[in-house]
Amino acid sequence: MIKVGIVGAAGYAAGELIRVLLNHPQAEIVFANSGSNAGNLFSDVHEGLLGDTDFRFTDELPFEKIDVLFICLGHGKSEEFLKNNPVPANVKIIDFAQDFRIAAPGNDYVYGLPETHRSLIAKAQHVANPGCFATCIQLALLPLAKAGVLKGDVVINAITGSTGAGVKPQSTTHFSWRNGNMSVYKVFTHQHLLEINQSIREFQPDFGGDLDFVPYRGDFARGIFTTVFMRTGLSQEEIDKCYSMYAGEPFTHYVSRDIDLKQVVNTNRALVHAQKYGDRLLVTSVIDNLLKGAAGQAVENMNIMFGIAEDAGLKLKAAAF
């Protein structure tokens, strides 16, 4: 069994991580650290776990008992945590924050998008789990970048559920504001653009266009729906060939019909659809922001790092209705 530790275990993504790991056939939670909830049952915080476990949160960090550590702290806090709490070299780390996603001297974290970095993840000691928007958008764009056919500016619109903002209450996550409402935020400046641009230029270094990304807050709890628009001279057949890279993928599927959120919510699945309209190309992609956009993808990365079946613990069914 893979012995697991979790830090920052009280958030939404951590709750999904716990849910997945409790049902994982080859992993066992050793500790789940949450200073503000030490001694409380998992189900006191993650109420959907009621009846599933009598495990309790702890304020301890017994690193010597684990094989892998999931860090589920807020952005900018992971690096500080690791400086103050050195983790033994033999313990693998999967970080949920953006602290290690951007390549830099001394940063040995592999970017954890399995569809493009599987072989590197398999050999990695440390993995930076991609952001939720970044995952959904890259799955729409990277097949074109890998084929070297992205040209000109790319317009991206993506709408996310309220869980993407985290568990701490904010004015823009309050039910009476969010319900029946939509809004934009961080227009053209969202932090996930850094990792998206990094990946595109990794596969297509000569791409010179802009990524014009407008994020939206949706009036639903979970999921991301992305549309990507660009001009192209490619035929539909050539476009389909680019996305054939997803053939055989355990979770990401290229489909020939329109897609919707309910097909992926509560799963680690990603769906991508690309359709040509004259000289215009529209690519749509959908994921669950808490699973393929966070906890599910983190477990997928763990599975790859330990050489077990990539879908272990992740055979989840969409709600559908």
Outline where the language-model segments fall.
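C-terminal substrate-binding/catalytic lobe of Rossmann-fold NAD(P)-dependent dehydrogenases
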Residues: 189-255
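Short Gly/Pro-enriched turn/cap motifs at secondary-structure boundaries
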Residues: 184-188, 216-218, 260-264
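Short, solvent-exposed beta-strand edge segments and adjacent coil->beta transition regions
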Residues: 124, 182, 223-227, 280-282
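C-terminal active-site/capping subdomain that shapes the small-molecule cofactor and substrate pocket
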Residues: 229-321
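N-terminal Rossmann-like NAD(P) cofactor-binding subdomain of oxidoreductases
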Residues: 1-180, 185-187, 205-206, 273-277, ...
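Predominant activation on well-ordered alpha-helical scaffold segments within soluble catalytic domains
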Residues: 18, 138-145, 193-197, 240, ...
